[in-house]
Amino acid sequence: SCLSSGALCGIDSNCCNGCNVPRNQCY
């Protein structure tokens, strides 16, 4: 799952676009 906030959100490997966008919802 994506981190919704905090220093790590931009490097969360499960996310894209920084925060709040799950990898499987990337375009």
From Swiss-Prot:
Disulfide bonds: 2-16, 9-19, 15-26
GO molecular function: toxin activity
Protein name per Swiss-Prot or TrEMBL: Conotoxin Lo6/7b
Secreted as UniProt keyword: yes
This protein's GO CC annotations: extracellular region
Origin species: Conasprella longurionis
Other comment: Negative results: does not show effect on Nav1.1, Nav1.2, Nav1.3, Nav1.4, Nav1.5, Nav1.6, Nav1.7. Does not show effect on Kv1.1, Kv1.3, Kv1.4, Kv1.5, Kv1.6 and Kv3.1.
Function: 1 uM of this toxin does not show any effect on voltage-gated sodium and potassium channels. Does not show antibacterial activity on both Gram-negative and Gram-positive bacteria.
Tyrosine amide PTM positions: 27
UniProt keyword Secreted present: yes
